[in-house]
Amino acid sequence: LQINVAANRNLERSLTFTNADGSVDYESYEGEWGYSEWRAQAGMVLSWDKWRLNWQTRYLGAVAQDADAVDDFSDAFTFSDTCLGPPTDELCRDYAEADSYMIHSISLFYNEDNWSLGMGVRNLEDKAPPLADPSEITGVKSRAIGYGYDLMGRAFFLNASYNFDLGF
């Protein structure tokens, strides 16, 4: 049995720069889109004879839009840039934050001396990435992209490999 756990806590992600008028501007990003406070990955490998079972979990902590960029009046004129429906519709709200996100993957492999076969499922629960307002973060069809979320959904796979001994 082999267990691997890696967790990262984002203590600070910031930018300080001097404006044209000489004033100093400081921007803190931790906890915002792309800079969740916590990220983790855990895996378990159980090997028995020629079999290997893998379980992997990925975790992204909750995130929120920069408080300075939140538009408190975004629905004042019955407009939402996440869909064409009324702004009171839950599916049309301004998505400025996302809950924590976790996905699981599992695979099973059989290994011989010079070949192996494997199969598995990525994103076992078919968990979609959180909804996001693409006018405020990088996104496509109200889904955040480039932040570590799985955009493909559940995926099944088969692997086969053969080691050709060429003698050199």
Residue spans of the language-model regions?
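Gram-negative outer-membrane beta-barrel transporters
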Residues: 1-67, 159-168
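Solvent-exposed loop segments that connect transmembrane elements
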Residues: 14-29, 65-94, 131-145
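Residues that define the transmembrane beta-barrel architecture of outer-membrane proteins
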Residues: 36-40, 100-104, 113, 152-156
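C-terminal beta-signal and adjacent terminal beta-strands/loops
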Residues: 58-74, 109-168
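Outer membrane beta-barrel transmembrane domains
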Residues: 70, 79-98, 102-111, 116-120
